[in-house]
From Swiss-Prot:
Its EC number is 2.8.1.8. Pathway: Protein modification; protein lipoylation via endogenous pathway; protein N(6)-(lipoyl)lysine from octanoyl-[acyl-carrier-protein]: step 2/2. Signal peptide: none annotated. Residues 68-282 form the Radical SAM core domain. The gene is lipA. GO terms for cellular component: cytoplasm. [4Fe-4S] cluster 2 binds at C82, C86, C89. It holds the Pfam family LIAS_N. Its main location: cytoplasm. GO terms for molecular function: 4 iron, 4 sulfur cluster binding; lipoate synthase activity; metal ion binding. This is Lipoyl synthase. SMART domains: Elp3. It is found in: Cytoplasm.
């Protein structure tokens, strides 16, 4: 696989340097088996019939069979070009298209058509917009709730530069879960996420928790971090009020992206899940093929249970989603 720059810009020096390392061969445990059931088949049929688009299919997520069987899906908003560049992310950076103000309605209609019990909404950073795209995130949550009152909504947001007014726009839409991903540890943070700041990301989670929202984040392993640094980042997240955590293996999208520093074995991921529980997270999912939206409805219910609350929004979630245990 050759290193080709996104259309409209030259290859960055960092990308050229990354490309000197060939794409790594995946270990045998980085694979998944196709397991389909009636719910998955029904959702797939609805998606095909209505011509809908989900991140699950378009990103080739290995967990699509499990998530769709639970009637969970993820949607990308704001376009497919980001104003920032993270060295692990497959979404290209550049000049985004104009804001599509009808997108929230279309996403909400897709959620209703698919009969989803839980929807995750993520998107690109839109630093080109005066409000950072905060209205788009908030309005998408509002539209989904309006059309599908029984559907839980998780929104995975950028940091909006830490601006309280932009964060409040999203918080005020009352998503069931407010997710903001820390992704990596302080020592390599600037290299991996140059447009973000470690402490600012923690502060987003603090503000979300102060607003009463269920909070969630993600850590990616295999970028060059040490075990001590992972543990410290987990402690920082918990201290910031983060309730739910996913821990994932870095999979390199293209030669332009950061090389995989190591493949983390499944048993180490189980160790990190135990560490997270000991630190006091309400729910942790940790595994080579776990992604931040994996079994999101189940994790949400673990947070609700830990808070001692009754189930609030997605009242028709099935027993499989309400279980606080899970299998990898």
């Amino acid at each position: 696989m050759s290193a080709v720059a996104p259309e409209g810009r030259p290859l960055l020096r960092l990308e050229a340097r990354n490309a000197q390392t060939p794409i790594e061969r995946k270990p045998p445990w980085i694979r998944t088996r196709m397991r389909t059931g009636p719910e998955y088949s029904d959702v797939k049929g609805l998606v095909r019939a209505a011509g809908l688009h989900t991140v699950c299919e378009e990103a080739g997520c290995p967990n699509i069979y499990e998530c769709w069987e639970d009637r969970e899906a993820t949607f990308l908003i704001g376009g497919d070009v980001c104003t920032r560049r993270c060295d692990f992310c497959q979404i290209d950076s550049g000049r985004p298209t104009p804001l599509d103000r009808d997108e929230p309605r279309r996403v909400a209609e897709s959620v209703r058509t698919m009969g989803l019990r839980y929807a995750t909404v993520t998107g690109v950073a839109r630093d080109d917009l005066a409000d950072g795209g905060s209205w788009l995130y908030g309005e998408t949550v509002r539209q989904i709730h309006a059309l599908s009152a029984g559907t839980g909504v998780e929104v995975l947001i950028p940091d909006f530069g830490g601006r309280a007014d932009q964060l409040d726009e999203v918080f005020g839409a009352a998503p069931e879960v407010l997710a903001h991903n820390l992704e990596t540890v302080p020592r390599i943070f600037k290299r991996i996420r140059p447009a973000f700041r470690y402490e600012r990301s923690l502060d987003v989670l603090r503000q979300a928790r102060a607003a009463g929202l269920v909070t969630k984040s993600n850590l990616i392993l295999g970028l060059g971090e040490t075990a001590e640094e992972i543990h410290a980042a987990m402690r920082d997240l918990h201290a910031a009020g983060c309730e739910l955590l996913t821990v994932t293996q870095y999979l390199r999208p293209t030669p332009r992206h950061h090389p995989v520093e190591r493949w983390v074995r499944p048993e180490e991921f189980l160790d990190w899940e135990r560490v997270g529980a000991e630190l006091g997270f309400s729910g942790v999912m940790s595994g080579p093929l776990v992604r931040s939206s994996y079994r999101a409805g189940r994790l949400y219910q673990q947070a609700i249970t830990a808070r001692g609350e009754g189930h609030t929004a997605a009242s028709d979630l099935p027993k499989s989603v309400l279980e606080t245990s899970h299998t990898q």
